[in-house]
């Protein structure tokens, strides 16, 4: 069979052509779709023309992306995607749409206990816009911890492993809060070093925003499941109040905070535990987390192709 896993649509017609030519089943796997974004973040940059012309070009580009993608989806034997919301969205074009979560490699991501000299909240990833990923609940909670003299910068750090564009967004969002002295910025690190970075952290940060028709929808990133796998407390701000929050709750891996008060209480609890023990820990539902391993993903795809090839 043919498996085409693509965000952009240009490989889809090629996969469709090969599948038809050689009479092979076609499985289309979409890890991202245009509709999940709050705005036009799926476009790497604007077209740097007049604003009205930019809008027109963007509308035309979006229309073509969706038209070509949906035509290919209708002809696929099976579609796979990453969240319940994505499944519901894509079933409109192909009823044979199945959920295959993003996941983690269990040979790389597993719990290690390290005593650390600092309490570290860690974020690894990218920010495209505050509409999609908004850290301000975190800043509000940390501001209160600082104001009430519950933390100090020598022991409490927020470490960002991000690119320059993400750093600019974070710094701009933080200007209204007295948190700059708690923050460190690092360049991206090699993938092989990520498990160690996560395991030496005290809280692992996921950034999101509330699910809305004009906001982000269905984001379930690989980094979410890698964070769950190492067994560190996971803090998501701001909760999507949807499938991301439900997954964090069902795995008992942390908190998807809807308010700054919730984030404040969560951070303080784990900070006080760290002060007593030198490390943090959370009792995740290991069986629930293991459902998201790459091994389970591979088994799902094997079942799909076995079923399609037996027709």
Regions found by a protein language model. Name each.
Residues 85, 103:
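Carbohydrate-associated surface elements
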Residues 113-135, 139-142, 297:
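Conserved donor-binding/catalytic core segment of Leloir-type glycosyltransferases
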Residues 258-262, 275, 279-308:
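A charged, aromatic-enriched C-terminal amphipathic alpha-helix characteristic of glycosyltransferases
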Residues 153-155, 162, 167-196:
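Nucleotide-activated donor-binding/catalytic signature segment of Leloir-type glycosyltransferases, i.e.
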Residues 1-11, 23-31:
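Short N-terminal targeting/anchoring amphipathic segment
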Residues 77, 198-217:
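Acidic donor-binding loop of glycosyltransferase active sites
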Residues 40, 91, 104-118:
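Acidic anion/phosphate-binding donor-loop and adjacent secondary structure
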Residues 10-13, 17-21, 34-36, 49-79:
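Membrane-proximal helix-turn-helix segments that form the acceptor-binding/catalytic region
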